[in-house]
């Protein structure tokens, strides 16, 4: 028989652990959601915008709570599936009446639609907030050879010299770039820089992504839509 004192001690430890988990989850929710962000989403996009923000934030916080570096592939799979199943592919001309438009994640989720850039942008910010380091992710402009058209995917590098995994809305399977012979990379970028992609996986850094006006416009609109916390790196990445 276990002494009663040990039982009480165990219960206290478990209760404290649960309280800490709940506190961390609450902090994550507060940082990526919050009353002010909900109100602004509703003012800009109505109730669908508010609900899209709430669902998105809760999903990402859940991924962050479950995040483990050695199980990063699971986070990639869940985030990739989340957007591939929630967004319908619609061209910019039909969706926004513009030849080319890069939507913010909130715009895409509110309208439940987007084109290739919109899938990638939403996955990029979601993965960073879920715990994946920014330097492992590159938004990559490619040519889709079978379709003979420009396309965009998200590349994940486990380390700088690795064969990146490709997150795509056309092919929902996450595969190494070496197995995506249907894609020819042109250039890539993230919040840390911009690269020209060469053959055999070689990349040449060419400076900052600030030269990409479409990217800078997305960042500005996210800020205007009250999504500044989604642009900030999580605390755990700032301390690395």
Task: List where the protein language model places each region.
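A structural boundary/capping signal
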Residues: 24-240
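Bacterial N-terminal signal peptides
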Residues: 12-21
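N-terminal secretory signal peptides that target proteins for export/translocation
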Residues: 1-6
């Amino acid at each position: 028989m276990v002494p009663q004192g040990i039982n009480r001690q165990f219960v206290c430890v478990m209760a404290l652990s649960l309280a800490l988990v709940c506190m961390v989850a609450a902090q994550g929710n507060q940082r990526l959601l919050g009353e002010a962000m909900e109100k602004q989403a509703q003012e800009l996009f109505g109730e669908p915008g508010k609900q899209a923000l709430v669902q998105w934030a809760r999903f990402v916080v859940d991924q962050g709570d479950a995040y483990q570096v050695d199980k990063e592939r699971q986070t990639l799979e869940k985030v990739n599936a989340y957007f591939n199943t929630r967004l319908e592919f619609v061209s910019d001309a039909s969706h926004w009446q513009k030849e080319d438009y890069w939507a913010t994640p909130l715009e895409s989720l509110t309208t439940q639609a987007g084109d290739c850039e919109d899938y990638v942008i939403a996955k990029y910010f979601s993965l960073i907030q879920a715990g994946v380091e920014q330097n492992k992710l590159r938004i990559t402009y490619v040519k889709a050879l079978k379709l003979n058209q420009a396309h965009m995917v998200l590349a994940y590098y486990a380390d700088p010299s690795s064969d990146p995994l490709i997150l795509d809305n056309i092919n929902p399977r996450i595969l190494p770039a070496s197995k995506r012979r249907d894609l020819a990379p042109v250039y890539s970028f993230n919040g840390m820089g911009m690269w020209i992609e060469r053959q055999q996986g070689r990349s040449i850094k060419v400076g900052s992504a600030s030269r990409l006006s479409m990217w800078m416009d997305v960042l500005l609109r996210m800020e205007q839509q009250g999504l500044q916390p989604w642009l900030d790196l999580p605390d755990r990445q700032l301390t690395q």
